[in-house]
Amino acid sequence: MTDNILFAFALTLFAGLSTGVGSLIGLLSKEFNPKVLTISLGFSAGVMIYVAMIEIMVKARESLVVGIGAEMGKVVTVLSFFAGIFLIALIDKLIPSYENPHELNVAQKLEECSENQKKKLMRMGLFSAVAIGIHNFPEGLATFMSGLSNPTLGVSIAVAIAIHNIPEGLAVSAPIFYATQSRKKAFILSFLSGLAEPVGALIGYFLLRSFFSPSLFGVVFGAVAGIMVYISLDELLPAAEEYGEHHFAIGGVIAGMVVMAISLLLFT
């Protein structure tokens, strides 16, 4: 059991720290390529949608059928899915749009900024870090519990969320870097925002460990699927189309689905 806990936590840490990877990519890149970002965001959406609908929803239903029976299991699976959508939509609603990391135009040329603009960018970057931390908290718990219940599923979710977190790291680091001209500050704040995932995993584990059961895991899986679909449709795909052509975004989605389908066939 201890090995399972450590493995699940390692997956969560991996997913969370990918925010720092996104920050590094943005800070070290000499030239912004919108096509690459468009394809990457589409790829992330494809991975998340495919994993959510093909893998996670199936696991949610299987767990709930074991826990509460076939008929109620089906109903609770669907309810859990939409509960996850409602939860992440509520979080988005509570965060004003200018503070939402997915609303930032990181492609904008900001080299020449006034002092007021720099202050605004710094505030935007800090709010983005907090917003991403709030988003990452339930994602961390979801990754951890998935890894604890089913290591293969946990890996799939961790990879999907890690890919999703990379552009978020860029969203935090870009405005902070342009405001301070400090790569170090931009990276540290982006890195810290990603640590919300392992923190969410630890807090969730200590609060819920006495309630672990197939039913609980099923509800969590259903909610995770809803969260991942919402993020893909509400955040990743619109952002992908904002930075590039529609066909590049859709190509990224299909590529993400193909890659995840092949990986699931090979490793499950």
Swiss-Prot record:
It is a multi-pass membrane protein. This is Zinc transporter ZupT. It catalyses: Zn(2+)(in) = Zn(2+)(out). Mediates zinc uptake. May also transport other divalent cations. InterPro entries: ZIP, Zn_transptr_ZupT. Zn(2+) binds at residues 139, 164, 168. The chain crosses the membrane at residues 5-25, 36-56, 75-95, 124-144, 157-177, 187-207, 211-231, 248-268. It holds the Pfam family Zip. It comes from Chlorobium chlorochromatii (strain CaD3).
